[in-house]
Structure formats: structure tokens, C-alpha cells
A protein has these predicted regions:
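Residue-level recognition of single "structural anchor" positions
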Residues: 1-273
């Protein structure tokens, strides 16, 4: 959706409400009946049990004092900004407080993070880790002192990136993460970190590359693609002045979501309502 199309489509609160009503499955929140009085979308009434509720109930817009036009503008900006938007910018553009701007973007990230990634059933995948410190991303060293561990699975042919924050890079954690997202039929490429030693017990096609010997083995094993993917993740975190440790997983999921595909306005809205 282009900017002029967006501006024409969502000029008023009523236009925004109508758009949500068109996307959302409208049923009673108590008895799940579909027979509703929808003359007032902010106060719909079930014709079976008389329950009244808003079309916004259950969405990120519920009980928000911020106008829907502002919310829609933020979502449009969020979609069209590859590496995220600082809350300071949103606060200035919408004329809201920094706290309100952060809360709005946090709600979007939280909903996006709940989307289940696509399970990889076949093909070649690369698995690697990235360590986030207070100074940014640093690949060297696996010490978790003042760092957060992010593990990723990447399949180049489908451009499918899956990320997760783990407590540490021990074998049982890495193996469980891989088993949850890829089939045992996949050809798995990793580096020679000892945490991947048990992968052969599950993935019969597991190959490693020792980075002390080079970036690509003699038979072509490498993790170059996923290591280059970390640049995208790095830029996302650098967009923001500071990211709390307990929110790192949300920003990482946001970055992966945008990396996998350019989401449409409708696709994102369906996640948020």
C-alpha cells in the first residue's frame, strides 16, 4: 500500500473501524453467536444473550486512548521501515508521549512474536548463534556475561529465518530448538561448537565447518548465509537507543518477521486483531 492510498483509505476513525470490522470475525464474546446488532461498532449487541461489546475487544486497540488513525499510521510506518522505528520518532510524529509511543510499538511486537514460524521439512539449513551485549552484537566469544544469546535457523532457498533467545548454548538447548523447527530429514550445517555435537543423533545429515580452517569446507559446508543475516538483526537493534534484556526476544522476532517477507498492511492487521 502506497502512502497516498493509505491517506485516502484511513482519514477518519469510522473508516478505521469499518476496516477492522471487515477483517475481523464478528461474534459474541460470551456465547459466540454471529447474530449481532452492528449499527454502532463500538457498542455491538448480541441478539441472543444481549451481551454488549466493542469491535475492538480482543485487539491491540482495545481500551487505548490513542486514536485509531494514529494507530493505523504507526502500523503503516512499522511495515515500511525494515529495521524498526525508534519510539522517539513515533512520539514526535504522532504528538504523543515517549511512554505512549513505546507502549504502542511494544504491543505490535508482542503480537507479531506470537506468530508461529513455518516448520522446515526438507532441504539445507544453517544454524548459528549471535550474542547481544550492551555494546551491540559481538560474534566473538560465547561468554554470556552481560550478553543475551540469540540462536537462528536459516534456509536460503525459502528465505526462512527462525530466531529464539536461549539461556545458553548448551547441547540440550540447541538440539531442542532445532527439533522444534526443522525435520530430521534436513541437511544441517553448523560450526564446530561443541553444543552441536549431539545433532548427529537426530539429524543424520549434519555437517560442520571449523572456522579456524576457513569459512567454507572442502565439500562446501558453510554458515556464511546465516552469519550475513545477523547484519539485518544488528541493524534492527541499533535503531533503538536501548533494549531491555527481557524484551530482546521481541525485537529479534520482529526482525525475523520482516526479514522473511515484506508484510502487507492486511497481513499485519490480521495479527493484531
Amino acid at each position: 500500500m502506497k502512502l497516498n492510498e493509505f491517506n485516502n483509505a484511513f482519514q477518519t476513525e469510522q473508516q478505521c473501524l469499518a476496516y477492522i470490522a471487515n477483517l475481523k470475525e464478528n461474534k459474541c464474546i460470551r456465547c459466540f453467536n454471529f447474530n449481532l446488532n452492528t449499527s454502532d461498532l463500538k457498542r455491538m449487541r448480541c441478539l441472543k444473550c444481549n451481551q454488549t461489546f466493542s469491535i475492538l475487544t480482543g485487539t491491540i486497540f482495545s481500551r487505548s486512548q490513542t486514536s485509531l488513525t494514529s494507530w493505523f499510521y504507526l502500523i503503516f510506518r512499522w511495515i515500511n521501515t525494515k529495521h524498526g522505528i525508534p519510539s522517539t520518532d513515533i512520539a514526535k510524529e504522532l504528538g504523543v508521549t515517549l511512554k505512549t509511543a513505546w507502549r504502542m510499538t511494544h504491543k505490535i511486537r508482542t503480537r507479531i512474536a506470537k506468530q508461529k514460524p513455518q516448520f522446515i521439512v526438507e532441504g539445507t539449513v544453517q544454524i548459528d548463534e549471535m550474542y547481544l551485549s550492551h555494546m551491540g552484537f559481538k560474534k566473538q566469544g560465547r561468554s554470556l556475561v552481560n550478553k543475551t544469546l540469540i540462536v537462528g535457523i536459516y534456509q536460503k532457498t525459502t528465505n526462512n529465518l527462525i530466531v529464539k533467545v536461549l539461556k545458553n548454548a548448551k547441547s540440550k538447548n540447541l538440539l531442542q530448538f532445532a527439533k522444534n523447527h526443522i525435520s530430521s530429514k534436513c541437511l544441517v550445517y553448523t560450526d564446530s561448537w561443541k553444543g552441536y555435537c549431539d545433532f548427529k543423533s537426530v539429524f543424520t545429515k549434519h555437517e560442520t565447518i571449523n572456522h579456524q580452517d576457513g569459512y567454507v569446507s572442502k565439500i562446501g559446508v558453510n554458515t556464511n548465509q546465516i552469519e550475513s543475516v545477523w547484519k539485518h538483526i544488528r541493524r534492527t537493534f541499533k535503531t533503538h537507543i536501548k533494549v531491555a534484556k527481557n524484551h530482546v526476544h521481541l525485537y529479534a522476532k520482529e526482525a525475523a518477521y520482516k526479514f522473511n517477507k515484506i508484510p502487507s498492511f492486511e497481513t499485519v492487521m490480521l495479527c493484531l486483531i
